[in-house]
């Protein structure tokens, strides 16, 4: 499972959400800050002929898009990464003003949900049907429709209308508005050496972060790109890395601007007064106290003070609770989610697989202070080459290459473990584990195809990733291929599992006996198995009303195909079996590792909430998210609890999280490495309505 990258036809809304990378020099020219580019009004011209594009991830060709123009425009878009990807067919009919008067989208999302979307203008009214249901609107409100499941070609559909508008801003259907900003002009070169002038743009209003793309000097789509993925005009594939690096730099500059506005650095010690401190050892809250921060350390935990000291900044905690910064243990780190995780009280990540160069750049930006984000602990991702492989980390074709990858990660010095993935040859795993352990690294991962969890336990895994990866071994035949969507759709078989059966008990007892961990990622399983078209996903109910309209729309979309009532029942019962399995694992002593594989932030709060359903108390959940994970990563001397001498990583909530864990969803203050952040400052920068007010600073 990896939701971390654009994984479905919803790509338009996710183009800038993933993260990272440094800005590549333009051809052989020296890299410079681009001058502001003025967006000029452009006439609406309908293209002719065929346009073709190549989809690429980290330099690898993974799919294509073809656009055929005639009386109508037909778009075919498909790519495959990690054994899955969207398949989209669109038919668009434009009026004389370039506005789609009919737009039909069909196909399947990355995880198999069927796409049957349509939009049509009839007279003075617009009618549309998407996963949320059917709606209509008067054309006086807006006449440009934002498709829910479109291909990246939708960027061009929107852009040419925005370019023709005076202020490059348009109200859109179903709600909201789009805004276009030109970024820079540059020249690219085709494989034949022909130069082409392009302009890059940022499109805002669809998602939390802008989408980045480029048009050529004729106004045609040239590319859409983020830090990992690029869809580029055929014949210009050599420009893919450059485009990705530009998208990364554009995003970095945006976040730099935001963090300059939201980061509070004080020139004297700061005391947070009148607070209770969560103690993960006693699983309780302290009496009312004050916590003093000097530079980036906790200097003292004292009694409440009655008046401000001229030598200190005093913040009124108003009787709220301080909790140590939390650990998102299944991240795929990206700059698009970094600041939002800080706002959610997540101050540490364990990255579970990434483009190694891109992640190095992100870590450098965070550690240098250029970007705000969690501390990142790295895992070395190793995948076997196959028609279904993921394109992260290092790809290998032989056991010797696999061992070489292990050694490379060990030599870097900052990877605490390796992560083995789906297409790895199971026969190579024992040697990889031996090498990793000899070099001081732990081993975690998926269960490779054509084997099972028992074999990986015997090979020496320290931790298994995703609860379905363990459970599939109890329901699949040996020749069934989990490199495909089968590893998700086969979860419909989980209701038949008998937790007390010998096979299940052997697996769980073996894990417990070896002191192994399970990173179950409950929230992603809930999302895959319980989300339904037209209904708000269960994990989003508590925050959806604060989100931008595009996110609210997305929240009412199924992730998997629910083709029949039997599918609905099977997935619901299968999810219940997942909870039963994780409860049994915990009861037997398997270490539970909390992570989302869904970007952390709001979903991380839901992940923690779900552990109450396996029998954990609220205090036990908070301890797991803080001190237990700091200990798991060998960082408990510095992080994981609020005590003098430790790093100042913690957050303030108005309520009592022991009485109600939902209190962690209303954070008023976050301190990370001695810098102070009010989520009420951060969220509006992403179009999110804050969940609570900032605390009062009593003296400055």
Where on the chain are the PLM-derived regions?
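Divalent metal-dependent hydrolysis catalytic cores, especially in the metallo-beta-lactamase
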Residues: 338-358, 375-382, 412-424, 433, ...
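Histidine-rich, glycine-flanked metal-binding segment
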Residues: 282-323
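Active-site neighborhoods of metal-dependent hydrolases
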Residues: 407-424, 470-614, 687-689, 698-700
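Solvent-exposed helix/loop surface patches that form functional interfaces
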Residues: 45-48, 60-62, 112-199, 225, ...
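Acidic, glycine-enriched loop/beta-strand segments at the rims
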Residues: 260-264, 277-290, 602, 617-622, ...
